[in-house]
UniProtKB/Swiss-Prot annotation:
Gene name of the record: lipB
Major localization listed first in the record, in broad terms: cytoplasm
Subcellular location field: Cytoplasm
Any one biological process term the GO annotation gives: protein modification process
Organism encoding this protein: Prochlorothrix hollandica
Known role: Catalyzes the transfer of endogenously produced octanoic acid from octanoyl-acyl-carrier-protein onto the lipoyl domains of lipoate-dependent enzymes. Lipoyl-ACP can also act as a substrate although octanoyl-ACP is likely to be the physiological substrate.
Enzyme's top EC category: transferase
GO molecular function terms noted in the UniProt entry: lipoyl(octanoyl) transferase activity
Region (Disordered): 42-68
Domain of life of the organism encoding this protein: Bacteria
Protein's UniProt name: Octanoyltransferase
InterPro entries tied to this protein: aa-tRNA-synth_II/BPL/LPL, BPL_LPL_catalytic, Octanoyltransferase, Octanoyltransferase_CS
Pathway linked to the protein: Protein modification; protein lipoylation via endogenous pathway; protein N(6)-(lipoyl)lysine from octanoyl-[acyl-carrier-protein]: step 1/2
């Protein structure tokens, strides 16, 4: 990753991997979406909202705040996750254009395997 920052002309890469059980919380997330009590170290400085009764922290998946948009995402073994790593400026400066292209490509791949994909 550091090499890519130094040289944006490196070839595009796709990372495919499985995560251990983990919840990631995007910028739009709230701890109200978590159905278990996170460890105190995770909630330090967070004002509780509508939780009626706090319960003791329970062992469970890891929690990580991220800089992505959206709310809460759960990743676990058996779930294949893909991370395209590329220089969008080389393709188009518009992130939404790229996402529509990626979406169309995945819909076509699904169709090739007899599965129906659609835009939401």
């Amino acid at each position: 990753m550091a090499d890519r920052q130094r040289d944006p002309d490196l070839a595009d890469t796709l990372l495919l991997l499985e995560h251990p059980p983990v919840y990631t919380l995007g910028r739009g997330s709230s701890l109200d979406f978590i159905k278990f009590t996170p460890p105190a170290s995770f909630t330090a400085g967070v004002t509780p909202s509508s939780r009626a009764e706090p319960t003791p922290p329970q062992p469970g998946p890891e929690l990580h705040r991220t800089e992505r948009g959206g709310e809460v995402t759960y990743h676990c073994p058996g779930q294949l996750v893909g991370y395209p790593i590329l220089n969008l400026r080389r393709l188009s400066a518009d992130l939404h254009w790229y996402l529509r292209q990626l979406e169309e490509y995945l819909i076509r791949v699904l169709d090739h395997y007899g599965l129906r994909g659609e835009r939401i």
